[in-house]
Amino acid sequence: MTQSTFSFNIAFTQSVNPPDQTVVLSATELWYGIRRGGRNPHDFAPYVASCEVLSGTQNEFCRKLTLADGAVHTAAGEDLIQDVIIAPPLHVQAKTVTTGATSTFLLSHGTAAKEDNERPELFLTAMYELKLDNVKPGTQAAKDIEFNYTALARGACDNAVRDIRKWKTEGKLAAWQREAEQDGAGVSNKGEILPYKD
């Protein structure tokens, strides 16, 4: 008898520029923060110890993550190989080669008829599609993973916006944008998508 694959899907969305926030992010700034996670996920996730890009282009590549403490279903020191797709200025998606588990960080806009340039209505969504072969659905182990993975996903969404805001105040977002534009990658300061060089 074949054991069924355990899967658990969860997503959280956060408003990026609520009325009480004094450090407002533009869509371009939010995008460069999200984009940073493709090659540098350890900047966002404390459970990632390091990341090495193995092959690929600027917007499609293979990376190796080495995990630290705090991951839900993997041990510290374990490596994950992931295929990453960056779709500027929309999302960064990473898919684990062995299981098909996927994480996506998505930038979206509100539906207001007129954009507020002083405080744009932006959202960050963190989506996680977990797949595991060594966990039986419906067991206590599966329930524990669902509980802990929900907390991890919620924290990832909260922390990503907080970190991107901090990077803006530290001047890092502007520096990363300049580097990307010099390489011909990313989004211009006018919000236009620039072509990627392979």
Predicted feature residues:
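Beta-strand/loop substructures that line and gate deep hydrophobic ligand-binding cavities in soluble
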Residues: K95-D158, R162
